């Protein structure tokens, strides 16, 4: 297998319920258009000059997709769960960083956490932050297991 530097990326977030926690996770992936592919977990560096997509489309079933993701599942009624990804893009789009967080919290709390992580990551590298993107999802568990997921999916084309 050969890997190439990604050229495009999609950022998104979703929640879902399911018969089990894993089914809830799968249902959230389906909402994002990535439920029929194989996610390959990445660490958190964005290549230079990446183009951002509005949505995922025409992805072959079973494709290996490099993905940074945060997720949480729960079957505890009344619990609020959230997942967030913060994306920092450097000035002149020379690269960037993605940080992920999930927990028993509101999406605003998760968003604040990833913003702090992005800012620290840039500070540690001596990079100047040009743009910040965030994707987050929140759900309160009712009578079925629930999941929240936030993703950045990278595409070689």
Swiss-Prot record:
The keyword Lyase applies. The modification Pyruvic acid (Ser) is found at residue 44. Its EC number is 4.1.1.19. This is Pyruvoyl-dependent arginine decarboxylase. The record marks 43-44 as: Cleavage (non-hydrolytic). It catalyses: L-arginine + H(+) = agmatine + CO2. GO terms for biological process: arginine catabolic process. InterPro entries: Pyr-dep_his/arg-deCO2ase (IPR016104), Pyr-dep_his/arg-deCO2ase_sand (IPR016105), Pyruvoyl-dep_arg_deCO2ase (IPR002724). SUPFAM superfamilies: Pyruvoyl-dependent histidine and arginine decarboxylases. The gene is pdaD. Gene3D superfamilies: 3.30.60.30, Pyruvoyl-Dependent Histidine Decarboxylase, subunit B. Keywords: Decarboxylase, Lyase, Pyruvate. PANTHER family: PYRUVOYL-DEPENDENT ARGININE DECARBOXYLASE. It is an enzyme of class 4 (lyase). Pfam families: PvlArgDC. Its cofactor is pyruvate. It comes from the Archaea. GO terms for molecular function: arginine decarboxylase activity. Belongs to the PdaD family. Binds 1 pyruvoyl group covalently per subunit. It comes from Thermococcus kodakarensis (strain ATCC BAA-918 / JCM 12380 / KOD1) (Pyrococcus kodakaraensis (strain KOD1)). HAMAP family: PvlArgDC. The keyword Amino-acid biosynthesis does not apply.
């Amino acid at each position: 297998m050969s890997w190439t530097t990604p050229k495009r990326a999609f950022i998104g977030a979703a929640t879902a319920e399911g018969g089990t926690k894993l089914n809830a996770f799968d249902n959230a992936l389906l909402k994002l258009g990535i439920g029929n592919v194989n996610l390959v977990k990445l660490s958190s560096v964005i290549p230079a000059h990446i183009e951002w997509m509005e949505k995922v489309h025409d992805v072959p079933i079973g494709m290996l997709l490099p993905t940074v993701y945060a997720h949480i599942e729960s079957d505890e009624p009344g619990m609020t769960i959230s997942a967030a990804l913060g994306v920092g893009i450097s000035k002149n789009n020379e690269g960037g960083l993605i940080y992920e967080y999930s927990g028993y919290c509101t999406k605003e709390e998760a968003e604040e956490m990833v913003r702090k992580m992005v800012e620290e990551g840039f500070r540690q590298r001596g990079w100047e932050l040009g743009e910040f993107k965030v994707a987050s999802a929140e759900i309160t568990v009712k009578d079925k297991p629930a999941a929240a997921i936030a993703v950045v999916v990278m595409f070689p084309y």
